[in-house]
């Protein structure tokens, strides 16, 4: 295809976040064709009913194509020492650029160049990245980086990639200025995270290094990362320090004259056994009987966290597995946008879900259609302005074609919708009162309604005796003793629940309110990635397998995590407290509402960082003396592990994880190029290869090719990986390339 095919001054350019998303947009036009030239891919589309019938160019990125510059790109003195056993130049820190600048991320240059030729010449740009803060950040950052005039920029904001909603979205474009504050919020968040992460990670890591404590990889400090780790550490301390205490429950063993027996209980628990009134008599009376019909409405629809919680409880899925499945279902047009914290829909969604009820019934044959009018519990346009709850789209999948996890996650979403259309759950609750203070209750299911989707088995009956008010019973008081139990360790699912409901752990009313409004630590869309990163990348937490079907591994801090948690709690406690996150979230929310300037917020972050640099060099060495670091193993006190002779320089040794900032292989010889072109262990992690092992590292550094499995879009490929000598980067090629 010749380059002349590419429009020189396009009327409209649609900027998508991902290739699949761009394809969905293009396919919504009646006329569409994909092209490729030397600069990349693009679509040319036209439709008499869309965008004035003009010619439209659709281009796609691959997520974030820009990143904040590294410290050394601002100032060569920021960052690392070239000599000695020091890696961070604390004498030139903290790192505080006067202006934060972006650069093109590794591997994204051609994507940016492809986008540039269209975006800079377009009469109107339509931002069509994901409808969230991150999507806004990706697009606006690129437009600003390319100096694109945003005066006439529009925003496509939709919650489904189906053809109908896409077309409707193009017919009802928003002005980009409406969503621009989301960019300000997210960009400011990324700068603040950079300031905290870059500076305090370097500071803590180097001070530990200087004082003889050498961990494998840096001691990562992050706004959400540290409080998340601290939740696990604090739970561990609660379990370790837990001391069982007795408590008592006052019961009456009752027997009718017909021989029917039951146990009635006094409400509450007693710590002091002597505080319980003694019942010495052997006969008592039934003082009251109440039977009430009670109703329970269906649960709310699910946001992403609710979906993850449900999948963990019912299916034993890890949160990240559920999120991945939901995002795949969104790409396939079977679910609405999953990265949401909203639990309601609009009447538009309610109506099409109602129309599709008979189709969904094929998945749940015993479903009934009772509730046909929208109720505010599930349908509330005022709360669904930006996003919706996760619900099925109009497109019905063939379940047999879906992978197991995707099928099950899809059915969870359908089930929540079918429950919304069902009748309430009705049951009769009977309470028998004995001697005024003791009660026993039982319930009989009258109509399971929506509960039938979640309650297994037939209607449950809890047997109660046939008695009357005033009837005399044989009674015997029995005080049962129990022991309190320690809290349970977190797993990935319960940790995310704790992150969501962290306000419940806070006493301060103001902080509690802010955290509740911010919906906890992180967001439903980011929590899984945060937990995964703390485990796999930073090695601060680890998973311990648990026996039992559908039981998730428990989480515990590693030796490295325990040490960092102690350091934080004794030197800079605020970094590990949800309170700091609450204050940040409140400030960022105000930025998105344009009531606080980004500069004012970042000035406060600046003060926090400077305070750490002024106090920690004195405090941290003292604190380290109070911490047992022996559990860190060889990396804790001794020199890095030697795995072999360096084939590059021939004189130095290849060291395993000698670098405190990165989990990498490097050379002991200061002049060796492997010192500046280290081989990072996690280079291939995003393709499913967890970590480069020592034996593999030696072969790669020698210039050999290693067979490996690459995972892309759920498919596995046989590849060969090798180290490019000129750059030190890991490259790959197909092991069995297709012949042309």
At which residue positions do the language-model features occur?
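C-terminal or mid-to-C-terminal helical accessory/interaction module adjacent to the motor/catalytic core
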Residues: 107, 113, 120-121, 163-250, ...
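Basic, low-complexity terminal or inter-domain segments flanking catalytic cores
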Residues: 2-13, 145, 152, 177, ...
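A short acidic, leucine-rich amphipathic alpha-helix
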Residues: 307-311, 495
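Structured, non-catalytic alpha/beta "coupling" segments that mediate domain-domain communication
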Residues: 39-76, 226-269, 418-463, 666-668
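Metal- or metallocofactor-binding catalytic centers and their adjacent structured scaffolds
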Residues: 177, 271-302, 308
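Intrinsically disordered, low-complexity regulatory segments
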Residues: 1-198, 485-486
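A conserved hydrophobic secondary-structure block that centers on an alpha-helix together
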Residues: 130, 314-318
């Amino acid at each position: 295809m010749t380059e002349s095919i590419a429009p020189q001054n396009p009327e409209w350019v649609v900027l998508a976040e991902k290739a699949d998303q761009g394809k969905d947009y293009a396919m919504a036009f009646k006329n569409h064709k994909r092209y490729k030239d030397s600069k990349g891919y693009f679509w040319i589309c036209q439709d008499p009913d869309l965008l004035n019938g003009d010619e439209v160019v659709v281009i796609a990125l691959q997520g974030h194509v820009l990143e904040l510059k590294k410290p050394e790109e601002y100032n060569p003195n920021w960052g690392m020492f070239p000599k000695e056993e020091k890696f961070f130049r604390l004498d030139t820190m903290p790192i505080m650029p006067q202006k934060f600048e972006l650069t093109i991320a590794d591997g994204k240059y051609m994507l940016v160049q492809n986008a540039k030729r269209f975006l800079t010449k377009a009469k109107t740009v339509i931002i069509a990245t994901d409808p969230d803060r991150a999507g806004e950040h990706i697009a606006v950052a690129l437009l600003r980086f390319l100096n694109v005039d945003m005066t006439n920029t529009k925003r496509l904001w939709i919650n489904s990639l189906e053809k109908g909603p896409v077309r409707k979205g193009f017919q009802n474009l928003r002005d980009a200025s409406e969503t621009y504050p989301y960019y300000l919020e997210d960009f400011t968040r990324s700068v603040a995270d950079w300031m905290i992460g870059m500076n305090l990670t370097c500071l803590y890591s180097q001070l530990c290094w200087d004082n003889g404590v050498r961990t494998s990889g840096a001691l990562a400090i992050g706004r959400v990362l540290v409080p998340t780790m601290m939740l696990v550490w604090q739970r561990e301390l609660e379990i370790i320090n837990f001391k069982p205490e007795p408590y008592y429950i006052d019961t009456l063993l009752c027997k009718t004259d017909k021989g029917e027996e039951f146990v009635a209980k006094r409400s509450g628990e007693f710590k002091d056994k002597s505080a319980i009134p003694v019942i010495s008599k052997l006969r008592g009376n039934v003082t009251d009987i109440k039977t009430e019909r009670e109703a329970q409405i269906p649960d709310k629809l699910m946001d992403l966290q609710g979906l993850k919680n449900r999948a963990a409880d019912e299916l034993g899925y890890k949160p990240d597995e559920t999120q991945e499945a939901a995002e795949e279902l969104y790409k396939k047009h079977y679910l609405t946008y999953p990265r949401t914290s909203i639990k309601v829909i609009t009447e538009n969604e309610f109506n099409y879900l109602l129309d599709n009820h008979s189709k969904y019934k094929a998945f749940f044959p015993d479903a009934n259609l009772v509730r046909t009018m929208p109720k505010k519990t599930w349908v509330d346009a005022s709360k669904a302005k930006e996003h919706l709850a996760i619900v099925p789209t109009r497109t019905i999948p063939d379940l047999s074609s879906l992978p197991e996890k995707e099928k099950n996650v899809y059915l969870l979403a359908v089930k929540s919708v079918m429950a919304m259309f069902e009748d309430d759950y009705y049951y009769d609750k009977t309470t028998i009162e004995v001697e005024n203070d003791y009660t026993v209750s039982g319930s009989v299911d009258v109509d399971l309604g929506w509960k039938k989707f979640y309650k297994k088995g037939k209607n449950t009956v809890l047997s109660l005796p046939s008695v009357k008010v005033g009837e005399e019973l044989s009674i015997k008081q029995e005080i049962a003793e129990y022991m309190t139990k320690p809290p349970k360790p977190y797993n990935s699912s319960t940790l995310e629940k704790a992150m969501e409901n962290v306000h419940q752990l806070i006493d301060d009313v103001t902080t509690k309110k802010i955290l509740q409004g911010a919906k906890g630590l992180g967001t439903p869309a980011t929590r899984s990635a945060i937990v995964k990163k703390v485990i796999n990348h930073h090695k601060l937490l680890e998973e311990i397998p648990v026996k039992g079907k559908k039981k998730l591994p428990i989480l515990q801090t590693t030796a490295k995590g325990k040490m960092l948690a102690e350091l934080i709690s004794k030197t800079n406690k605020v970094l590990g407290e949800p309170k700091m996150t609450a204050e940040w979230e409140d400030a960022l929310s105000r930025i998105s509402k344009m009531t606080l300037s980004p500069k004012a917020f970042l000035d406060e972050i600046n003060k926090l960082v400077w305070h750490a640099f002024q106090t920690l060099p004195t405090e941290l060495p003292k604190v380290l003396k109070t911490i047992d670091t022996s559990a860190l193993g060889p990396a804790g006190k001794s020199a890095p592990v030697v795995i072999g002779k360096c084939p590059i320089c021939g004189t130095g040794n290849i060291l395993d994880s000698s670098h405190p900032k990165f989990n990498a292989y490097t050379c002991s010889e200061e002049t060796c190029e492997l010192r500046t072109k280290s081989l990072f262990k996690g280079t291939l992690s995003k393709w499913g290869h967890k970590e480069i092992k020592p034996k593999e590292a030696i072969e790669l550094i020698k210039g050999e090719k290693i067979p490996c499995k690459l995972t892309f879009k759920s498919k596995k490929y046989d590849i060969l990986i090798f180290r490019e000598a000129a750059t030190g980067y890991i490259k790959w090629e197909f092991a069995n390339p297709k012949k042309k």
